């Protein structure tokens, strides 16, 4: 016993004794009163009362938004929102709500699934001054409708997904669906009508929300809470619970419970992040969702908390529990892992009246301390009578958190909300009384015996109970049961705890006919139900599932002989609970069997689930096969547990599976064993043939991709879809390639590139290439480094044009991205280009989501990748699918819509029409819009073709395959299947549509067989797969795409040339007619792409009108017969008559079938020759057909054959003595035609290749044959091109497709002659050319510091590189740079040294030393090099910076001879744990572009993460010397013809020649459109020179990157590619300033391709300038790149960078350096010149500023002269 309790009881004992001494005539009740001392103690606990907080919670949220607008406020499964966004969106929506209804006391229901938009809706209602009522769409419609009727809703906010439900439950209200598109449409700045209202201040006394709870009359009761009431509790409560700005708070609670309001408002008011998982993950994978969202704080019931995995608890800062009691064992267990908080609070007094902020602190559980209130305990029968301390009493809550009462229910309000109770007015001896309002909770509690005043929960007083966290009014259940049972039935709902263990269970006790008393004569309290009553119970149960939530449905109906009653004639509930405690779980199931038919569990899965049910629900495993999980005590929580338990037993279930299939038998049918794909990963190279060695696969793949072998990560087969797409794109080059563009602020674009880099590393499909492996076919190769990025400083339209012309084919990247400046603005265009072979419409949003999450620093992992899907396809047994499609397509009629103009016609879509079909919002159908469209189109086709058997193709998502996480796999899975519909005009429309829906579901397991495989199954399948119409049901473009969201920039990508993704899909049309239907909320947009030779534009317009009419008829009259709407008007009928083939009877009704003409009959009866008999037998075996289905007139292609089957046919035929070739098979109209051989040398080469590819003899190929006549296809065309190039013939796939004959193809080929040998630009020593022998490794090796070094390459240095080498070798060594990498925290020194040496090993230029041989400076690449690495301790007391700089000075003065390494590292360590790595490097080895990559590599090497790849500098040298310079010489000759160097030399003599500089920033925010920033300083400098020197032709220098010369992966070249090149401006007298800018920009773009030539090379080879007098530029313009100042260095180490150039480069010229500032709105100009000329420089800088002003908008159109 606690000391306080002992003292209290002694005082109480003394008080009793004292009273007894005074007189013994006191009633016993007198001693139940609280003593004066105890009353004083109670008042001390409750004084002072917290004052009311007079502000609104949304004001706090607004303050947070103003402070941190860019911070993530909501991180939800459906997207993120920043504080700035929720503030903006809620403001706009609030104004709209005011415009719609500004009356007082408005109550607005809110109906959302878990979503980021819920908080926006709630805040908007708060700001508008209205009151919200949160609803959960999972609740029954009857309950939702009862709530809505009470609030008399005129406006209803819902999500788009719940808008239909909202309309049903509130038919009189205005439904406002909330989504991103809602804000875009209504609040767009381009919308004519804008909400024009202001938001009035909201009084704290106004109602904030209404919380509906279970009602005793059967109707939910709504408790009203004002702003101040909520805030008065929320603010102190949040502080105790643990909401902080860094918190990531789980949004778990259902919207039906008020805890969710705290989750939203407390989180946002404290600047934290609300993490909202989807409802599916919330129920099925809570631990996974919390892990992915990095949740730090979660609130839930203890029952749910028990399902969390251990690592989740370990990573939580706090977990708040409420809704039900917390066991001490749970509290102690969880308290060892995280801080456990317990909350209590009835809805009538806000969410939490008490908070125990450390549950594990005591060996028992208290309700915690008061928050915003006072707590009193009274006699349950008399609220004015307080009970003594330690006694059990009803909990009363007083204070500013007590609500206003119940909506429209004054009697109930008066019953439990008490104004000025007597005990409160009276006070105590030490505390004066006060006025106040209390709420009677009905909860029985007592105060903690340790004297701190904390209450301890004991039980409930009334019929309101809590079961597994859900608050239940038993009377509401009884009310709803009684409605459906005979009037003389007695019943009582109760929560019992059956004997034998297990959790509490809701049951109903029933007496079939009213009887009073207790026992039957035999002493048994239990009765029985008649058959008629059992039927009534079954019907009632069905209705309960409609009217009540599942947790309010009794788990069992217990029959009683009589209902136990109290003396007061009330039901004796205590006795009922005693009876309930005497029954077992088996008894409950036995009672239930009385109202359900018993069926034994028999199957293996039923028995397994039966055992799992027993573990979860208690008792023995004797469940019936038709027992209902929820009737047996299950609920949503147990469903979650069952999912996890089943997974542990190797069974796959989901919560929806359980919800939709609650009986044991139906659940067992839905359950399936865990597949191998779900339990194992797919190792690299595990899906290639066993006879293909992994090393050989790597080498072959690397060769075909043109990459290093080490870059190959995996190889596996292509899907049939990928094979077809990559092949067809070779025929139509840009048809299957999409470009998308996002225009973004420059800084955001650069960050987005980094996010893409991260996303690409995590998404193998983006790094995938497709190759053709000789003899094996097509494979996809995943590279470690996809080499996908490029940057251009050009106009975006030009970039798109060039990018479109860069093919995506075999061996090349199928996904790439680039940055393009937006001329005249601070924006950049981010362009992505992607081939359909690596994406589809489903997967691209997943890629963008991955990019957005990377952009925001969130996790990007996904459970599965494309290779898991490939493994699934490989594992499939096609027999089931073959049987399904064979039966499904049996008897298909060949004549389909639209008909072809003639047999063999190749369709080519050339026309496009759009038609919008409006679907009335009042039209409700149980079937999806997709099913209605399928059915309507089948009827349209039938009307036009005149028969009832319709086939068309539909492209599906393909994501119904049983691959775990398939919905999150990035990659193309779309598949096309033939949809066959047979119409019966006498059937009802609803039945017809239901049949189509059922067919769609049935085909799901078979949809990946592939059209090419389906068409081989039979003659009918071939007919069916000759598809004329393709249907794509395209979901509306993600509402977030195309909108500027700085937190999710990947959502802003739009198709480069088309406004919508649906239109983009039309580019992929290979049908006579393709219908892309974009499904929207109120209808669908049909885009029809068609061949006008098959159907005219006018006729197609009428077809779409018929489709529109039929859709409306289906929706309006679903019970009508199909024939009632199968009507064409006269003009439409005339169109149909003209389209129908002659062999379809024109006067037939839809029941008629086509007949074969006499020709086909004769052919089928023709006697077969012996050879034809042999061929038919072989074909039947190869194609899996009956021989009787094969006629002599059939061609192999018509029978469904392909190139592989053709080779099998040739092989088998030759074995039987038939001399057949693949060419004969494909070319002929029958199977016996022959072909002749080709002629001439080129044709002979091609014929030889074709014979190998097509498996035919050369002699069977003639020059007049076309590739496709010979049996070639798109895949074969790519193989032909690849093999031809290997034979020295350069042809393209386009040429293969365009050539009508082999002769034409041969004549178009470019043959590489011996005089034009193919050059391997990667070969070592090749850049030395004819001097390679002179500068041999043996000779050059003599110059090396260590003659034991192994030389792998030698190249001539570039001009600037040579100067840098001299500036390193010779004093003062101005080309040496020292990079200081400063670590503030301790670093692993050994690991750092290893990272530095590995850095050198990875980068060729770092292990390059420089020598001078015969006057030529050479770069000598070593196979390996250990560079100097030293450690130096900074002495105690020394200034670290000064000590390090002294060390650098000493180092730079030491000799750096030719032949030695210029690279060195020195780690300076400090006694405080900090350190500084000094990295020495020469400008001969780097430029400013590549150095940041070096530091990224060093960081990755230290951290052990993926290291960015770089391109060796020698590759750049080879490309420049062998390829670029020869092309550049003519360009520079032409540009500089007749020019001379412009000289700007003041008359001031130079004496000291020291450098000086002057700097100023200029506003360029008004630069003209389509002009790059880089054009401005160049144009301005040209103007200054022209005006200062009175010249119209000026030449000066520019510093360029040297990386735009066409070399692959130029941005990853590691080495000094930079160059000084000449820039010439020959002014025209007619120019405006804008003309000058365009001229400069054009020269920039043109010169970029030739910028690799050095200045001395240009002077020598391209000008008539005197090399002696013109040794350098007089003036140079330089736009400085950005530099990294700090970056993470791995393992939590942060690095800061400082650069030291101990000696400045000698000044040779005027420098005009430009720096982009303020996001491109300003340009900093620095003029560097000699000290003596600095005064002159001030004037020059002023003139530059004036020139820039002339180049801005407003003056750019003025004439220069």
Swiss-Prot record:
Q: Identify the Pfam families for this entry.
A: AMP-binding (PF00501), Condensation (PF00668), PP-binding (PF00550)
Listed A to Z, the keywords are:
Ligase, Multifunctional enzyme, Phosphopantetheine, Phosphoprotein
- Stated EC number for the protein is 6.3.2.-
Which intervals of the chain are annotated as region Condensation 2? 1354-1677
- Per the record, the domain of life is Eukaryota
Keyword rRNA-binding annotated: no
| UniProt modified residues of type O-(pantetheine 4'-phosphoryl)serine | 636, 1203, 1274
**Entry protein name:** Nonribosomal peptide synthetase 6
Origin species, per record, is Cochliobolus heterostrophus (strain C4 / ATCC 48331 / race T)
């Amino acid at each position: 016993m606690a000391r306080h309790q002992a003292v209290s009881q002694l005082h109480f004992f003394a008080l009793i004794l004292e009273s007894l001494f005074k007189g013994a005539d006191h009633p016993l009740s007198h001693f139940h009163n609280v003593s004066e001392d105890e009353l004083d103690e109670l008042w001390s606990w409750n004084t002072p009362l917290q004052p009311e907080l007079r502000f609104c919670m949304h004001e706090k949220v607004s303050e947070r938004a103003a402070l941190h607008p860019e911070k993530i406020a909501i991180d939800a499964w459906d997207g993120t929102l920043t504080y700035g966004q929720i503030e903006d969106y809620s403001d706009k929506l609030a104004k709209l709500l005011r415009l719609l209804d500004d009356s007082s006391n408005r109550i607005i229901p809110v109906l959302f699934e878990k979503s980021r938009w819920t908080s926006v809706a709630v805040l908007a209602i708060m700001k508008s001054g209205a009151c919200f009522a949160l609803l959960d769409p999972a609740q029954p419609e009857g309950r939702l409708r009862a709530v809505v009727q009470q609030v008399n809703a005129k406006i209803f906010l819902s999500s788009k997904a719940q808008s239909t439900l909202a309309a049903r439950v509130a038919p009189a209200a205005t439904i406002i669906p909330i989504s991103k598109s809602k804000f875009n449409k209504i609040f767009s700045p381009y919308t004519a009508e804008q909400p024009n209202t202001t938001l009035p201040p909201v009084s704290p006394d106004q109602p904030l929300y209404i919380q509906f709870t279970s009602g005793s009359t059967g109707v939910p009761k709504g408790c009203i809470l004002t702003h101040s009431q909520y805030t008065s509790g929320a603010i102190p409560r949040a502080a105790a619970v643990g909401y902080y700005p860094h918190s990531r708070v789980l949004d778990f609670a259902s919207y039906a419970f008020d805890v969710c309001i705290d989750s939203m408002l407390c989180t946002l008011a404290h600047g934290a992040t609300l993490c909202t998982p989807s409802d599916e993950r919330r129920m099925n994978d809570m631990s996974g969702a919390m892990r992915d969202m990095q949740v730090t704080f979660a609130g839930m019931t203890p029952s749910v908390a028990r399902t969390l995995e251990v690592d989740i608890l370990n990573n939580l800062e706090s977990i708040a529990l409420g809704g039900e009691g917390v066991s001490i064992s749970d509290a102690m267990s969880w308290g060892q892992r995280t801080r456990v908080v317990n909350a209590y609070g009835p809805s009538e007094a806000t969410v939490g009246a008490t908070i125990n902020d450390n549950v594990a602190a005591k060996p028992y559980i208290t309700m915690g301390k008061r928050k915003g209130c006072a707590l009193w305990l009274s006699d349950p029968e008399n609220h004015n009578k307080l009970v003594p301390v330690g006694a059990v009493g009803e909990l009363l809550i007083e204070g500013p958190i007590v609500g206003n009462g119940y909506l429209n229910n004054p009697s109930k309000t008066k019953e439990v909300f008490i104004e000025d109770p007597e005990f409160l007015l009276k006070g105590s001896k030490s505390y004066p009384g006060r006025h106040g309002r209390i709420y009677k909770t009905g909860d029985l509690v007592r105060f903690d015996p340790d004297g701190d005043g904390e209450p301890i929960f004991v039980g409930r007083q009334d019929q309101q109970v809590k079961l597994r966290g859900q608050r239940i009014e038993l009377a509401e259940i009884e009310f709803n049961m009684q409605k459906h049972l005979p009037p003389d039935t007695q019943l009582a709902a109760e929560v019992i705890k059956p004997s034998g263990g297990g959790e509490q269970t809701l049951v109903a006790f029933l007496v079939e006919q009213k009887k009073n008393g207790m026992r039957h004569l035999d002493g048994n309290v239990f009765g029985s139900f008649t058959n008629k009553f059992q039927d009534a119970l079954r019907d009632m149960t069905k209705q309960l599932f409609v009217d009540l939530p599942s947790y309010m449905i009794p788990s069992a109906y217990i029959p009683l002989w009589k209902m136990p009653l109290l003396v007061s004639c009330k039901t004796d509930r205590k006795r009922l609970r005693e009876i309930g405690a005497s029954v077992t779980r088996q008894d409950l199931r036995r009672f239930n069997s009385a109202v359900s038919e018993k069926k034994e569990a028999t199957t293996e899965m039923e028995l397994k689930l039966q055992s799992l049910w027993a573990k979860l629900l208690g008792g023995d495993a004797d469940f019936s096969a038709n027992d209902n999980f929820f009737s047996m005590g299950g609920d949503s929580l147990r469903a979650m547990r069952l999912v996890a338990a089943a997974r542990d037993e190797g069974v796959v279930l989901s919560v929806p599976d359980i919800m939709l299939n609650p009986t044991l038998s139906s659940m067992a049918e839905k359950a399936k064993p865990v597949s191998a794909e779900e339990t194992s990963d797919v190792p690299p190279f595990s899906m290639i043939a066993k006879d293909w060695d992994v090393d050989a696969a790597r080498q072959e793949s690397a060769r075909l991709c043109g990459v290093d072998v080490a870059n190959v990560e995996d190889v596996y087969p292509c899907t049939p879809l990928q094979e077809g797409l990559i092949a067809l794109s070779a025929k139509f080059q840009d048809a299957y390639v999409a470009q998308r563009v996002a225009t973004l602020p420059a800084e955001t674009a650069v960050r987005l590139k980094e996010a893409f880099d991260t996303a690409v590393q995590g998404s193998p499909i983006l790094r995938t290439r497709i190759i053709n492996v000789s003899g094996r076919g097509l494979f996809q190769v995943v590279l470690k480094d996809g080499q996908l990025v490029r940057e251009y400083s050009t106009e975006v339209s030009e970039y798109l044009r060039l990018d479109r012309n860069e093919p995506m084919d075999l061996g090349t990247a199928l996904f790439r991205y680039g940055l393009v400046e937006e001329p005249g603005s601070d924006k950049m265009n981010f362009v992505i280009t992607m081939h359909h072979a690596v994406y589809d419409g489903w997967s691209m949003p997943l890629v963008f989501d991955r990019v957005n999450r990377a952009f925001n620093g969130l996790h990007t992992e996904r459970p599965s990748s494309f290779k898991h899907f490939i493994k699934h396809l490989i594992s499939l047994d096609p027999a089931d699918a073959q049987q399904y499609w064979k039966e499904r397509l049996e008897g298909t009629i060949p004549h389909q819509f639209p008909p072809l103009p003639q047999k063999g016609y190749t369709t080519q879509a050339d026309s496009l029409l759009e038609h919008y079909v409006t679907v009335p919002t009042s039209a409700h159908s149980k079937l999806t819009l997709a099913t209605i469209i399928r059915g309507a189109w089948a009827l349209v086709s039938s009307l036009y073709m005149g028969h009832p058997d319709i086939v068309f193709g539909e492209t599906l998502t393909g994501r119904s395959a049983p691959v775990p996480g398939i919905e999150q796999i990035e990659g193309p899975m779309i598949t096309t299947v033939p949809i066959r519909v047979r119409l019966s005009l006498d059937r009802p429309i609803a039945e017809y549509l239901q049949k189509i829906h059922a067919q769609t579901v049935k085909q799901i397991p078979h949809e990946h067989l592939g059209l090419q495989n389906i068409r081989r199954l039979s003659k009918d399948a071939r007919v069916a797969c000759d598809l004329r119409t393709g249907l794509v049901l395209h979901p509306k473009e993600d509402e977030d795409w195309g909108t500027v969201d700085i937190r999710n920039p990947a959502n802003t990508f739009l198709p480069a040339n088309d406004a919508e993704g649906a239109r983009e899909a039309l580019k992929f049309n290979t049908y006579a007619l393709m219908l892309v239907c974009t499904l929207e909320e109120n209808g669908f947009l049909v885009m029809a792409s068609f061949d006008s030779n098959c159907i005219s534009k006018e006729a197609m317009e009428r077809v779409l009108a018929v489709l529109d009419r039929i859709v409306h008829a289906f929706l309006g009259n679903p019970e009508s017969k199909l024939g009632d709407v199968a009507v064409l008007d006269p003009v439409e009928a005339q169109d149909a008559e003209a389209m129908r083939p002659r062999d379809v009877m024109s006067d037939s009704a839809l029941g008629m079938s086509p007949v074969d003409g006499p020709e086909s009959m004769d052919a089928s009866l023709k006697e077969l020759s012996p050879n034809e008999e042999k061929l038919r037998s072989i074909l039947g075996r190869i194609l899996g057909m009956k021989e009787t289905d094969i006629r002599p007139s059939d061609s192999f292609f018509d029978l469904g054959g392909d190139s592989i089957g053709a080779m099998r046919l040739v092989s088998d035929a030759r074995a039987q003595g038939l001399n057949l070739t693949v060419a004969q098979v494909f070319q002929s109209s029958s199977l016996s035609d022959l072909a002749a051989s080709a002629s001439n040398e080129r044709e002979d080469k091609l014929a030889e290749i074709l014979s190998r590819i097509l498996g035919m003899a050369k002699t069977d190929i003639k020059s007049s044959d076309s590739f496709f006549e010979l049996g070639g296809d798109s895949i074969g065309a790519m193989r032909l091109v690849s093999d031809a190039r290997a034979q020295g013939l350069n042809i393209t796939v386009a040429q293969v497709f365009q050539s009508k004959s082999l002769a034409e193809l041969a004549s178009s080929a470019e043959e590489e002659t011996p005089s034009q040998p193919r050059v391997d630009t990667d070969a070592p020593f090749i850049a030395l050319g004819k001097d390679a022998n002179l500068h041999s490794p043996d000779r050059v090796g003599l110059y090396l510091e260590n003659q034991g070094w192994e030389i792998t390459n030698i190249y001539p240095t570039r001009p600037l590189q040579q100067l840098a080498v001299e500036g390193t070798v010779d004093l003062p060594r101005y080309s040496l740079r020292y990079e200081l990498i400063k670590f503030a925290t301790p670093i692993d020194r050994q690991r750092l040294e290893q990272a530095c040496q590995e850095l050198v090993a990875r980068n060729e230029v770092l292990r390059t030393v420089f020598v001078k041989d015969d006057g030529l400076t050479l770069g000598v690449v070593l196979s390996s090099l250990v560079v100097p690495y030293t450690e130096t301790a900074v002495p105690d007391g020394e200034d670290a910076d000064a000590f390090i700089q002294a060390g650098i000075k000493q180092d730079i003065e030491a000799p750096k001879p030719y032949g030695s390494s210029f690279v060195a590292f020195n780690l300076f360590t400090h006694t405080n744990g900090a350190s500084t790595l000094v990295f020495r490097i020469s400008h001969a080895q780097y430029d400013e572009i590549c150095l940041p990559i070096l530091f990224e590599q060093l960081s990755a090497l230290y951290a052990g993460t993926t290291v960015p790849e770089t391109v060796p500098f020698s590759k750049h040298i080879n490309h420049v010397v062998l390829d670029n310079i020869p092309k550049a010489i003519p360009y520079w000759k032409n540009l500089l013809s007749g020019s001379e160097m412009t000289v700007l030399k003041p008359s001031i003599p130079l004496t000291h020649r020291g450098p000086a500089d002057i700097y100023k920033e200029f506003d360029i925010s008004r630069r003209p459109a389509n002009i790059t920033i880089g054009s401005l300083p160049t144009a301005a400098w040209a103007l200054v020179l022209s005006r200062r020197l009175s010249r119209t032709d000026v030449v000066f220098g520019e510093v360029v990157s040297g990386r735009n010369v066409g070399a692959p992966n130029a941005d990853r070249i590691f080495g000094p590619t930079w160059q000084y090149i000449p820039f010439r401006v020959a002014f025209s007298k007619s120019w405006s300033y804008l003309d000058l800018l365009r001229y400069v920009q054009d020269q920039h773009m043109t010169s970029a391709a030739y910028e690799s030539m050095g200045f001395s090379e240009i002077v020598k080879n391209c000008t008539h300038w005197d090399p002696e007098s013109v040794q350098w530029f007089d003036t140079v313009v330089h736009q400085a790149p950005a530099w990294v100042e700090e970056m993470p260095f791995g393992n939590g180490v942060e690095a800061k960078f400082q650069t030291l150039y101990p000696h400045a480069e000698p000044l040779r010229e005027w420098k005009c350096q430009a720096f982009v500032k303020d996001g491109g709105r300003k340009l900093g100009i620095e003029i560097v010149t000699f000290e003596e000329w600095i005064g002159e420089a001030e004037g020059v800088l002023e003139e530059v500023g004036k020139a820039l002003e002339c180049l801005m908008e407003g003056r750019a159109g003025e004439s220069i002269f």
